[in-house]
Amino acid sequence: MPAQPNPEVLVISASHGENLALAERFAEAARQQGAEAAVLDLTSVELPLFTSRLQGAAAPEALAGLQSQLAGSPRWVICAAEYNGSIPPVLTSAIAWLSVQGSDFRALFNERPVVIATYSGGGGHTVLTALRLQLAHLGAQVVGRQLVSNRSHPASDDSIADLLILLLR
């Protein structure tokens, strides 16, 4: 589903299913706090897997739209499942594509406030640690608190609201 242009909070889902549902909850909670919010489902963006062989090739058509959506939203929430103890390939590949296009990809990340969250069948802490490291390396300001949820510990509305309060400061 395409995100609306320039929402105050862009909630990015790096997997479908439970993390997309979590992303929708974040977007609704942001709206309840008076912020414009939209959900970007990365699994619906038609980007090929980034490889070094493609680096010199023309950028995929969908990349410009993705870059525009990300640049147009001052705050992000990223909801990502844990894949083999790390970041979902769709998110890693999107970041790689963004990093090789344009002259200053770091401007997309520098000082951008970001909340990270997961619904994971496993622990979920490993993906958030990996994501925090990567986003901090790129210059993002990752909110200190994060949200870990799973079947036995679902995300509470209060936790989502509290994270958004921190993000919207």
Language-model features, listed with the residues they occupy:
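Glycine-rich phosphate/pyrophosphate-binding loop and the adjoining helix
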Residues: 1-7, 27, 141-169
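N-terminal beta1-alpha1 ligand-phosphate binding loop
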Residues: 2-35
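Hydrophobic/aromatic beta-strand patches that form the interior of the parallel beta-sheet core
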Residues: 10, 38-40, 77, 115-117, ...
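Cofactor-binding loop segments of dinucleotide-utilizing enzymes, especially the Rossmann-like FAD-
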Residues: 14-16, 42, 119-121
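A general structural signal for well-ordered alpha-helical segments in protein cores
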Residues: 19, 23, 63, 91, ...
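Short beta-strand elements in bilobed, periplasmic/extracellular small-molecule ligand-binding domains
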Residues: 34-42, 49, 141-150
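N-terminal beta-loop-helix "entrance" segment that forms/cooperates
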Residues: 42-60
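Helix-loop-strand module that forms the ligand-binding subsite of alpha/beta enzymes
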Residues: 58-138
